[in-house]
């Protein structure tokens, strides 16, 4: 499909990733890191998905705007994304909020996070800008979205999901005509507009926008001069373009990278503990909807130098094994069992311990005889010998962060308070 053009449009584009959000609904999991820096899938970080999509789509100029507790995010990107080469017209810029426009002003909104760095963007002279949220899990070819943008002559093209209307109230929702030209855009409406010909479904914004660079610069400068603006794409920029220009919807089904043709598209907002937990466990399915084994569309991340995973002991009641689980490098499962779980790098499980439906972040240690069910362990947690979680809801709720569905988040501080 790409040979329609003499060269991919992605070569003329710059991806700009908005990665400054806290993600407060993830509770203590984001106390010390921004949401895009949260671990996912056994070895990656959430931001790796947007960045990998950009690289795999052919985009070689990338900027990442950071703000809230950005140290771990910046450190990760410096280690994992340092392979871009200026001599090949490639660039990777990390852009922390730094009062570049005003000494009293940090990033005030998503649009402002782009506006404050217009001079840096201009230095690369991209023809198109692809604005991305850095906190979603999905695979997508942005080149196909760029192509629709150019062919439609739109001022902005918005990536969108087809979702049931009853589920669309938490999104920015678009009303469209039969050609997918956007006629209205409303943030989190109580009564979302339906899709023509399929009124039970709605088009929800993915937080992905494609602009011609000149148009984007002009509208951001105009917005910056408006004292009533909240400096936000969803609240201010997009509704204004819908009223006064041409906005087009790009359906995710047209550019998603599927695990297989017969498998539905996969996109997840992992903004709550339950959503984060379930998206991780999705990867333990026999045929997961999100294919992390696809060498044609890999998820790039930091390649830590570490030993392979190891399973030891083979006795009745003390057999090191994992079933329907993802076990990362440097893990040791010593006479323990993991069922439908993800063990990130460097996890150690002591003899006679078990975990079932568990998301265990890097360098955790699970003591002998501990039993864990439906848990998220923050990185570096040391579970005491014999601790049981997931069998007594009232006790779990007093000691840990427990969701309504029974998922328990456990942090170092919570374990310290048990003593």
Swiss-Prot record:
Keywords: ATP-binding, Carbohydrate metabolism, Glycogen biosynthesis, Glycogen metabolism, Nucleotide-binding, Nucleotidyltransferase, Transferase. Its EC number is 2.7.7.27. Pathway: Glycan biosynthesis; glycogen biosynthesis. It comes from the Bacteria. One of its GO terms (molecular function) is glucose-1-phosphate adenylyltransferase activity. The keyword Transferase applies. Signal peptide: none annotated. It is an enzyme of class 2 (transferase). Alpha-D-glucose 1-phosphate binds at residues 107, 172, 187-188, 205. One of its GO terms (biological process) is glycogen biosynthetic process. It catalyses: alpha-D-glucose 1-phosphate + ATP + H(+) = ADP-alpha-D-glucose + diphosphate. Homotetramer. Involved in the biosynthesis of ADP-glucose, a building block required for the elongation reactions to produce glycogen. Catalyzes the reaction between ATP and alpha-D-glucose 1-phosphate (G1P) to produce pyrophosphate and ADP-Glc. Belongs to the bacterial/plant glucose-1-phosphate adenylyltransferase family. This is Glucose-1-phosphate adenylyltransferase. It comes from Novosphingobium aromaticivorans (strain ATCC 700278 / DSM 12444 / CCUG 56034 / CIP 105152 / NBRC 16084 / F199).
